[in-house]
Amino acid sequence: MGDDLCVAQVQEWADGLAELSALIGHRFARSEPREHAVAYIQGLLSAEERKNSWTLSERAGDATPNGMQRLLSTTDWDPDLVRDDLQRYVVRYLGDPGGVLIIDETGFLKKGTRSAGVARQYSGTAGRVENCQIGVFLTYAAAAGRTFLDRELYLPKRWTEDRDRCAAAGIGADVEFATKPELAMAMLQRAHDNGVPARWVTGDEVYGQYSRLRNKCEELGLSYVLAVGVNQHVIAGPGKLDGQELRADALIAALPPQTWRTLSAGRGAKGDRRYDWARVRVHGINFPESVYWLLARRSLSDQTDLAYYLCHARAAGRA
């Protein structure tokens, strides 16, 4: 029974890879890059500890990494079209009307100055300013699983204002400066256009503080829970302070003690993550006629350690 299950599972994986290969294969005009693309995916899914052109080429039976390197650098194929294919694949197997779109960024440490977008900039991955590239990512979480959906490379202004440097790094002349939230907005729009079903958007303060991104969520019919800073201005909702504009921390500080409730935020690496939580209704900054929530999370061990979130739900749901 166990061996039969193992064989069936391996066959299912093989069938899945064949389906994926057929889905994206037409994006590669020649057989060589098409075969390397499939081998590259197999390598990424393998148990190889180090995954680079050398190790993936060796695994594919190539004597040199040239084929893999050409696939990633000079071969004529459009990664954005492949991304669109893969988003439709995600919809087929993971699509969920209650899905969550998660915006986040990560830093890739670099030593040189030639890699596209590399600069001395803050990296949340390192927790400090480093010479690095910053990628903004859109991921998807649903009951059936979770996966990456999209990506954008953040280009600091010093890059987009230096067209010669951009050309040397392979960045097109039509690429203009965009903030990280603007990159996130473009990815949300693409996911929507590709039919990715979702109910919620989440993101940290970099994205939550940007009102245009919150507007974009609402335009796309998406609810959100987005982190904001202590100095985020909100308009108090129904109650004694109704209509007053206050900082997020000031409005939460005005809540009576009984407002707070201890709830779990789920299990983490060190066990159950429990916090105190409080919420208060606020009027919309973007659409004053709408009603939203300001949510606060407080550490159980340090009551000065708080995080704030602006929340909005579509009419059929609850914030």
What is the predicted role of each segment?
Residues G2-V201, V206-S223:
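Conserved, well-structured functional cores that handle cations and Mg-NTP chemistry
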Residues A18, G127, A144-R165, A169, ...:
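An anionic, glycine-rich sequence signature occurring as long contiguous blocks
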